[in-house]
Amino acid sequence: YSAEKWATLRDNIMEYGELADLIHEYNPTVLSNRSTYKDQKNKNLNDIYDDYMKDIDDIWDQADNADNDVTWASLRYSAGLLTKQADNNYEDAEMEKIQYDQQEAKLVYQAQEMMVSLEQSAYNLENLQSTRDLLQQQYEATQAQMSVGMATQTDVLTALKSVQDQDTAILTAKKSQENVHRNLCLMLGWSADAQPEIKEVPQP
């Protein structure tokens, strides 16, 4: 990355267009996978393969000297297993790289979905609060009506319950929003209680 690009990734601003880079650089799972892959690559795979081949040759020598068919068959089976393991180990590092890349792509997609969800939850909370304000007005109006004999105690209690139910819905929505916010921050390298500035998701 350029110095300017690094600066934008570290500016405490969460932008939709930067999610892939943030995942690549700061996601704990991606960082762990990258470390594991480097360790695997640092091993001399050719030496490991050669060691397997030597072991297999030794087994074949034992098989040639086997004094019965059962021993020969058993050694031949062992040689076959080792050959398969040698081939698998030789390919493991690159296969892991492919799997890690696929996992990283999935994490980017999840982060994108979560950022969209976070924006939608903000609109949802606004609507819930607007509805709550209306229900509060209705409750107060019902109280006023009861004072002049135009509504019953039951009407007042029903109106009050509507306000309380709406408060519960708002609380649930806020908790859900906080969970998404916290998990998204952790995915992108921020702390769980971080409060980065979150930009709007661009329109498709």
Language-model features, listed with the residues they occupy:
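Short amphipathic coiled-coil heptad-repeat segments
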Residues: 176-199
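Amphipathic alpha-helical coiled-coil segments
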Residues: 82, 86, 96-103, 165-181
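Helix-turn-helix repeat elements of alpha-solenoid scaffolds
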Residues: 88-94, 132-136
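Extracytoplasmic/secreted envelope proteins and their assembly/folding machinery
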Residues: 16-20, 115, 136, 160, ...
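Charged, solvent-exposed structural "stalk/scaffold" segments
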Residues: 124-172
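Bacterial Sec-pathway N-terminal export signals of envelope proteins
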Residues: 1-60, 64-67, 71, 78, ...
